[in-house]
Amino acid sequence: MTVDRQMRRYSVPRLSFINKMDRAGANPFRVIEQIRTKLRMPAAAMQVPIGAEDDFAGLVDIVRWKAVYNEGTKGNVVRETDEIPAEVLELAKQKRQELIEQLSDVDDEMAEIFIEEREPTLEELVAAVRRATVACRFSPVFLGTAIKNKGVQALLDGMCAYLPNPMEVRAVANDTAVAKRLAAEANEAGEDVTAVQSTAQRGSEVQLVPATEAPLVGLAFKLEE
């Protein structure tokens, strides 16, 4: 919950990854419902699992409509096919429709497509997910089991496809040097420095631009239990 508050405070877009899909009792759709209710964030699965628990074999990409399998000793061989397993076909159709409905609640262009009762194209669906994610109005949810490298590549692809690049993010920093100088000048002039000191503590806001030749700016933080 603390991480969620910080992400909202700083307008950080998010993807969600439900790990350990090979564990007993794994239920990704219950987790997605908790994201919606407890975090109050519209969310929907981008995939449905093929098999469950020890029989977790792969994923159906409901955006590109492909079955994806990670094979090899470390799951590093990715095999895709257009043949969706019959046992998950109806679930995949249902979750794709759910994805479209969730997006139509937060994206105007997808809402128009939904009202027209038209099936969105791949490009329209990807664009809608990206717009809603970048705007911090939606979280696409990916599934997998990291230790077996299943679903990890799809998550990385999702980061590239749906999260903003540095040029799309408004990055700001606090320049305390200028504010402190103004506070010192006000103090020397015998003026009320209370307001200026308050500004000095938090610093004046400065817009940052990604540039290799610019000075380094970093954010240091500490996590505590």
Say what each PLM segment does.
Residues 1-225:
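Structural and coupling elements of P-loop NTPases
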